[in-house]
């Protein structure tokens, strides 16, 4: 009987675990038995999907919010720590911009949110921003850019870590802008950076492109500021908004 179950599971694209559960499950009625078997299959698939999402996300290491220190971190009034931990902003395709000095915990927070999103069954990718640009440039040279952009378009969260650490040439800037523009109001972004908006012209090749990129990032975004640079960064943002 076990072999027959495995055969039917394969034909119906059910997991081999379904056959094991079917052999072990009990129930006073047929309906209770079937409910137990199906519930076990749903649980198995959910765990498998979470693990696959974590594997594909490309995190440097798995981080969580356990023992994370929120002291000296400025969170905007429309967010709470609990909502942040739950990655609640993803439901509205909103963005996070994490700004502060090196070593302040920006990458840790971005990763922890990404891990939580994976645990919720969402598709996430984590990139060092320079690595993403290099991958885009290489894909264009190899004729596979559309394939990469299609892959990115299926995400629910794209994390760009170390934004602005390395300046980009014209091609890299334009390709990164294309990715950000494609995300606009469709999927969420998390950006980690230690560079003020007023200095982003030094990162990207073109001032006009820089302005357009900032506009798309800031709209529907929450600013989370690490350390004591809160006023300076907010002032930089206000100056940009007035232009």
Tell me the role of every PLM-derived stretch:
Residues 6-61:
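Interdomain "pre-motor" coupling segment immediately N-terminal to P-loop NTPase/helicase cores
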């Amino acid at each position: 009987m076990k072999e027959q179950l495995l055969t039917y599971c394969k034909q119906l694209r059910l997991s081999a675990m379904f056959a094991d559960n079917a052999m072990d499950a009990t129930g006073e009625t047929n309906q209770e038995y079937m409910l137990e078997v199906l519930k076990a299959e749903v649980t198995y698939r959910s765990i498998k999907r979470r693990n696959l999402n974590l594997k594909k996300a490309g995190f440097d290491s798995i981080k969580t919010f356990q023992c994370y220190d929120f002291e000296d971190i400025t969170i905007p009034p429309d967010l709470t720590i609990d909502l942040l931990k739950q990655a609640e902003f993803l439901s509205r395709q909103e963005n996070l911009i994490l700004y502060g000095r090196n070593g302040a915990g920006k990458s840790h927070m971005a990763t922890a949110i990404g891990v939580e999103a994976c645990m919720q069954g969402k598709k996430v990718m984590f990139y060092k921003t320079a690595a993403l640009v290099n991958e885009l440039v290489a894909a264009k040279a190899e004729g596979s850019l559309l394939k990469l952009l299609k892959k990115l378009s299926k995400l629910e969260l794209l994390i760009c870590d170390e934004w602005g650490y390395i300046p980009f040439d014209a091609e890299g800037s334009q390709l990164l802008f294309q990715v950000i523009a494609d995300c606009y109001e469709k999927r969420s972004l998390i950006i980690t950076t230690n560079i003020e908006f007023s200095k982003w012209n030094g990162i990207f090749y073109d001032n006009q492109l820089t302005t357009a990129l900032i506009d798309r990032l800031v709209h529907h975004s929450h600013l989370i500021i690490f350390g004591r640079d809160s006023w300076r960064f907010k002032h930089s943002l206000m100056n940009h908004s007035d232009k």
